[in-house]
């Protein structure tokens, strides 16, 4: 039966402290990448939800405006179909009052829709920063990992710069 050899060193990196440092840095970059990716996904989801709520408000606004228009047309039609104003005065007053009520409601609905639009724009901006940060972190992870194949130190240098940019963009995305 053959004997099993157990190597305690990690291949040819056992004495290479720089490789160990790069390995730890790659792990840290991976953790930061995971956090930024989750933040990016959440920002995109929030933007979609806000956009949906904004669209709902605009649909509600349009429905109220349509009702207002129908009441205005009804009042005009009632006036035009009779020569006796006293017969339609109550109907016209009712329609005019309801139309004014819808006009007031639409102002508030429009205000809410515009606020949702601002929230959507803010979330979309956050998502873009986080997406770009995610891309730089991925680039940093890959470039740093190339050290293990090439033993060239400029790969981790480029990788750390890219990861630094990605981290800054990620932080900006979270703080926005």
Language-model features: where?
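Residue-level detector of functional hotspots within protein domains
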Residues: 17, 24, 33, 118, ...
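Hydrophobic side chains within alpha-helical segments
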Residues: 67, 75, 134-137, 141
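Internal alpha-helical transmembrane segments
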Residues: 1-43
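Cytosol/matrix-facing amphipathic helices and coiled-coil assembly/linker segments
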Residues: 37-127
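Surface-exposed loop/turn and secondary-structure junction residues enriched for glycine/proline
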Residues: 41, 51-52, 133, 144, ...
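Hydrophobic alpha-helical segments, principally membrane-spanning helices and signal/leader peptides
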Residues: 15, 47, 123-125, 144, ...
């Amino acid at each position: 039966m053959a004997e099993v050899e157990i190597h305690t060193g990690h291949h040819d990196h056992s004495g290479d402290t720089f490789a160990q440092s790069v390995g730890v840095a790659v792990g840290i970059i991976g953790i930061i990448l995971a956090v930024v990716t989750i933040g990016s996904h959440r920002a995109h989801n929030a933007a979609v939800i806000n956009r949906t709520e904004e669209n709902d408000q605009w649909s509600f606004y349009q429905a109220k405006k349509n009702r207002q228009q129908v009441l205005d047309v009804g009042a005009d039609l009632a006036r035009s179909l009779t020569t006796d104003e006293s017969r339609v005065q109550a109907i016209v007053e009712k329609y005019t009052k309801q139309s004014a009520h819808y006009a007031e409601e639409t102002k508030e609905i429009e205000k809410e829709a515009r606020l949702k639009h601002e929230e959507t724009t803010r979330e979309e901006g956050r998502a873009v920063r986080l997406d770009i940060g995610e891309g730089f972190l991925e680039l940093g992870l890959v470039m740093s990992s190339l050290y293990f194949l090439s033993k060239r130190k400029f790969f981790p240098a480029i990788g750390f710069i890219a990861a630094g940019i990605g981290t800054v963009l990620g932080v900006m995305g979270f703080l926005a």
